[in-house]
Amino acid sequence: MNTDLLSSDGPGRTGRRKRARKERPTPERFSQSPWGQPQYVDAPTEALDAQGVERIHNAAMQILEEIGIDFLHDDAREILKQAGCEVRDDSPTVRMDRGLVMQEVAKAPHRIVMTPRNKERELVFGEAYAAFCQVSSPPNVSDLDRGRRVGNRTDYQNLLKLTQSFNCLHFVGGYPVEPVDLHPSVRHLDCLFDMLTLTDKLVHAYSLGVERVEDAMAMVRIAAGLDEAGFAEAPRMFTNINSSSPLKHDWPMLDGAMRLAKQNQLVIVTPFTLAGAMAPITLAGAIAQQTAECLAAIVLLQL
């Protein structure tokens, strides 16, 4: 029975006053499901049959073996060279044997438990689990009262508070709006501070070079009350990196990703291409290129 429909009003109360009271916002009006991570029940739709998947896979392997991927990072190329990849001193291009690729990719776990500072917000990445986050890094924000405006710290903080409040949002996937009133040189410090003080959910760090990543790891470690060894015992934060298509990984993202991987933190590799601009115009060709770019970075990070 819906108790909102029950009333203890006497006969002198009017229907209008009853409706007015009913429409007044209350905490119960914004009820939500309890915190929890959903799991998919149905198997995902297979876009291709087994033969089609194998053709895409073989095309990606051919790209890695014959064309190669540019790694614009000296340490990354040296690591790959020591692993047996073809690396030339006069070129950033690295070619990989498919045997090495499959060997290293097979080491990546199928299930990762992410542990933020509040262990009750623990998440599973992989298997049939789903995890949702808010949008990341839009330049502008808008609401009904003030309309559209450039991102700023106040709105950034308010959106973080909403992220914390909604149980359907499981982690902080980046800046919910870019606070452009903070200077870029220190923006990551203020933004991470707000993430760690206004939310207790899993946080993300942008993989943009040495200082930002090292600062982010230190702040997450301090917020969780851990020493360096304790921080590295389990994944407690994550980043995602994009390839610089076509067939290239640049220095800032590689450096940040490598630093996080050394501390056993999660790195998600997400190639971003536009078919016909940064990738072949055909869907199959674009997917083969993306697969090659993704696998190349995963091999490096597993090494």
Listing of model-derived features with the role each one plays in the protein:
Residues 1-155:
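Acidic/polar, glycine-rich intrinsically disordered N-terminal extensions of enzymes
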Residues 147-303:
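Helix-rich catalytic cores of soluble enzyme domains
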